[in-house]
Swiss-Prot record:
Keywords assigned by UniProt, alphabetized: Cytoplasm, Decarboxylase, Lyase, Porphyrin biosynthesis
Protein's recorded name: Uroporphyrinogen decarboxylase
Site (Transition state stabilizer): D75
EC number: 4.1.1.37
Localization per Swiss-Prot or TrEMBL: Cytoplasm
Catalyzed reaction equations: uroporphyrinogen III + 4 H(+) = coproporphyrinogen III + 4 CO2
Signal sequence segment: none
Complexes and interactors: Homodimer.
Gene assigned in the entry: hemE
Alphabetized Pfam families for the sequence: URO-D
Family: Belongs to the uroporphyrinogen decarboxylase family.
């Protein structure tokens, strides 16, 4: 049995590491040929509902790319179906919900979640990975209340989130009832993942950049504080928060009791430090760069890694998820470069 690679856990705490840890959002699936073969036969939900298949997909990038963490293969919509949300993942579109939330009565009809009863396949996958002696920490995750709510209100992906914002401004009773419900189910869902063996949790707030600071502070931040504090009340598990196009919210995020602040590619590590970020930082190569020639990739890698080495407490990642078009050998080469360039 290989010894446990806990580099990412050390980096989060600010402890000395042998190299900068690296993993990639959406590293499990998408660009992997083995995964594409599975998708010819199974849907996303079918894979995530079969622990053996899901564990296999989760483990692949650790073996193929030598990443310093595994991220559980599943969708942020996973906990919504059991509470009464009729959600379907449609190819080329994303999550589509046939019963969007419109009134407080719609929120009241939502049930609570019992992870052991409602999503046993998620917990069984985590346990299976633990039993298989996964040699890196496993990252579990959940969607943030705003991002989950936006899907539930809009009925699917949106560019402007008009219905979501309209509810916030017009019907605070329904909005805050939905926020509180999503916080409650997310705490239970995350705690169950940790109890099953997840050692790090990432909260994806993918669409929160659509809000200005004032609205975030009033409509979202209390729920985020409640969610993160609620998880920490059970287990002091490291929590990463990531959003897209939300650099204007960095100061608000820095106030939250998170351990790691995830940056997209629009904000440099230096800029985040100048804004007073005192957490570990994760990021933040533009995923598009992975489609460029290697000399361009290497130049961008050096720039990001040098900024990370200067501040410490840095986890290398992309500024969003891996594109399906990215070649597996590119990801393997990036991981190798990060490890070698930052070796101490």
């Amino acid at each position: 049995m290989r010894s446990k690679n806990d580099t990412i856990l050390k980096a989060i705490k600010g402890e000395s590491t042998s190299h900068t840890p690296v993993w990639f959002m959406r590293q499990a699936g998408r660009s992997q040929p083995e995964y594409r073969k599975l998708k010819e036969k199974y849907s996303l939900f079918e894979i995530t509902h079969q622990p053996e298949l899901c564990a296999y997909v989760t483990h692949l990038p650790v073996d193929n790319y030598q990443t310093d963490a595994a991220v559980l293969y599943k969708d942020i919509m996973t906990p919504l179906k059991p509470i009464g949300v009729d959600v379907e993942i449609k190819s080329g579109i994303g999550p589509v919900i046939s019963n969007p939330i419109q009134t407080v009565k719609d929120v009241e009809r939502l049930s609570q979640i019992d992870p052991k009863r409602d999503v046993p396949y998620v917990l069984d996958t985590i346990k299976l990975l633990t039993e298989e002696k996964l040699n890196v920490p496993l990252i579990g995750f959940t969607g943030a209340p705003f991002t989950l709510a936006s899907y539930m209100i809009e009925g699917g992906p949106s560019k402007n989130y008009n219905f979501t914002k309209a509810m916030m401004y017009r019907d605070e009773e329904t909005w805050f009832a939905l926020m509180n419900h999503l916080v409650d189910i997310s705490i239970d869902y995350v705690v169950a993942q940790v109890e099953a063996g997840a050692e790090i949790i990432q909260i994806f707030d993918s669409w929160v950049g659509a809000l200005n600071v004032k609205d975030y502070r009033y409509y979202i931040k209390p729920a985020m504080n409640k969610l993160i504090s609620g998880i920490k009340a059970y287990y002091d598990v490291p929590i990463i928060l990531f959003g897209v196009g939300a650099s204007h919210l960095i100061n608000e995020w820095n106030d939250l009791p998170i351990d790691v602040l995830g940056l997209d590619w629009r904000t440099t590590i230096k800029q985040a430090d100048k804004m007073g970020v005192n957490k570990a930082i994760q990021g933040n190569l533009d995923p598009s760069v992975l489609l460029a020639p290697w000399d361009v990739i290497e130049s961008r890698l050096k720039d990001i890694l040098n900024q990370g080495l200067n501040r410490g407490k840095h986890i290398f990642n992309l500024g969003h998820g891996v594109f399906p078009e990215v070649k597996p050998e590119t990801l393997r080469k990036v991981t190798e470069f990060v490890h070698n360039y930052t070796a101490k």
